[in-house]
C-alpha cells in the first residue's frame, strides 16, 4: 500500500497512449488546463536536455517525433509538475547518451521518491537504492516478490550466490536420494 503521505503522483508510461500521439507539442504542453506546469522548471529542464523551448508551441504532432524525443518531452512535462511520487516505466528506452546521463543524475539527486521499472542494468546499478524484484516461479504459475534494501550490484551478487547455493543443495539432495534408492 502506498503511504498516505504522498499526495501528488506522476507517471511516465512505457509507451504514450495513442490518443496523446495525435496532439501537437503545443496542445501536449499547454492544452490540458488541469495540469499545472512550473514554467521555470519546464524551461530549465528543456535547456538542460538541449530541447529547443521554441518547439513547445509547435504544431508538430507527437506521433512524428522519434522515440527518444517523445520520451524527452514526456519527461519535460512530468518533471515540471508538482509531484511527491514519480513512477517511471522503462525510462531509459530510446534515450540518447546525454539524456540518459542527465536522467541518472536527476534520479540520483532528487529528494523525492521515484519508483521505476527497468531492465537496463546500467541504469539500475547507477541509480537504484532499493530493489523490488517481481518474478514468476514454479513454471511461471506463482508470483514471488522480493524486497531488498540494497543497491543493484549488491542485490545481483546476493541473488547469484543464492542461486548457486540452491543448485548445490539440489545436487546434494539428488545424490542423497540416488544413494537411498540404490540400497
Feature locations, PLM:
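Flexible nucleotide-interacting loop at or near the entrance of a catalytic core
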Residues: 163-183
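ABC ATP-binding cassette signature C-motif
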Residues: 1-166
Amino acid at each position: 500500500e502506498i503511504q498516505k503521505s504522498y499526495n501528488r503522483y506522476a507517471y511516465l508510461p512505457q509507451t504514450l497512449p495513442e490518443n496523446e500521439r495525435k496532439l501537437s507539442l503545443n496542445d501536449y504542453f499547454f492544452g490540458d488546463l488541469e495540469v499545472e506546469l512550473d514554467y521555470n522548471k519546464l524551461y530549465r529542464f528543456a535547456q538542460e536536455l538541449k530541447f529547443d523551448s521554441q518547439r513547445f508551441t509547435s504544431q508538430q504532432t507527437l506521433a512524428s517525433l522519434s522515440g527518444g524525443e517523445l520520451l524527452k518531452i514526456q519527461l519535460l512535462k512530468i518533471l515540471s509538475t508538482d509531484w511527491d511520487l514519480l513512477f517511471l516505466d522503462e525510462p531509459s528506452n530510446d534515450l540518447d547518451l546525454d539524456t540518459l546521463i542527465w536522467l541518472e543524475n536527476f534520479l540520483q539527486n532528487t529528494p523525492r521518491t521515484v519508483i521505476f521499472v527497468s531492465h537496463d542494468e546500467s541504469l539500475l546499478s547507477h541509480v537504484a537504492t532499493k530493489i523490488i524484484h517481481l518474478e514468476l516461479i514454479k513454471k511461471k504459475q506463482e508470483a514471488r516478490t522480493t524486497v531488498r534494501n540494497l543497491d543493484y550490484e549488491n542485490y545481483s551478487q546476493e541473488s547469484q550466490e543464492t542461486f548457486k547455493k540452491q543448485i548445490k543443495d539440489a545436487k546434494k539432495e539428488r545424490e542423497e536420494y540416488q544413494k537411498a534408492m540404490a540400497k
